[in-house]
């Protein structure tokens, strides 16, 4: 019973944003946290970097550059998603169009928020990220835990629980429903 779109293999366009310590307030400034729906946050992702003071696109911000338009894989620096634990940051990136984020490391809470929102966070060393950033498209194979460019393949680690959720398209509710008969049995025993 898939509740979210499963991730098995994914081929997508990349955009590099090699800043370290990108915090959740830089991903989605708190001024935009006025709704509880998961949608509608994409236009505010990286708001302070993405737009000039007059509201026009910042041409120096990589995701705004023509060669990166439509990118669905973000390759970034270390300690991505640090700061406050707002799930809105994951919502904003997902709504922007990212399906996979490759970083040197992630904040633990942000990592979990990605998986809960059907985004795959991948940890790779800097040399691997720099190599992958040379290409327009790369491919991710979650069951085999690899990220590939046309000429090289990199292995990544992921906890089996998160991998199972993403490969099978399971959210927390779908996982709970797998144990429905055991829950009902326990409730009857009370």
Swiss-Prot record:
Entry GO CC: 3-isopropylmalate dehydratase complex
Official protein name in the record: 3-isopropylmalate dehydratase small subunit
Enzyme class label: lyase
Domain of life: Bacteria
One Gene Ontology MF term: 3-isopropylmalate dehydratase activity
Cross-referenced CDD domains: IPMI_Swivel
Listed pathway(s): Amino-acid biosynthesis; L-leucine biosynthesis; L-leucine from 3-methyl-2-oxobutanoate: step 2/4
Catalysed reactions, semicolon-separated: (2R,3S)-3-isopropylmalate = (2S)-2-isopropylmalate
Name of the coding gene: leuD
Keywords attached to this entry: Amino-acid biosynthesis, Branched-chain amino acid biosynthesis, Leucine biosynthesis, Lyase
């Amino acid at each position: 019973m898939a509740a979210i779109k499963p991730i098995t293999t994914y081929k997508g366009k990349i955009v590099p944003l090699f800043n370290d310590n990108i915090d959740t307030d830089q991903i989605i400034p708190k001024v935009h946290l006025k709704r509880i729906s998961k949608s509608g946050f994409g236009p505010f992702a990286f708001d302070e970097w993405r737009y000039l003071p007059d509201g026009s696109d910042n041409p120096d911000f990589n995701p705004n550059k023509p060669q990166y338009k439509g990118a669905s894989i973000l390759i970034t620096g270390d300690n991505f998603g640090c700061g406050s634990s707002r799930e809105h940051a994951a919502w904003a990136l997902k709504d922007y169009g990212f399906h996979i984020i490759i970083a040197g490391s992630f904040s633990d809470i942000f990592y979990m928020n990605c998986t809960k929102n059907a985004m795959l966070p991948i940890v790779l060393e800097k040399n691997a990220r720099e190599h992958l950033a040379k290409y327009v498209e790369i491919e991710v194979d979650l069951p085999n835990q690899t990220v590939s460019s046309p000429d090289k393949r990199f292995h990544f680690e992921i906890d089996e629980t998160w991998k199972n959720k993403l490969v099978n398209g399971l959210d927390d509710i779908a996982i709970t429903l797998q144990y429905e008969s055991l829950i009902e049995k326990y409730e009857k025993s009370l």
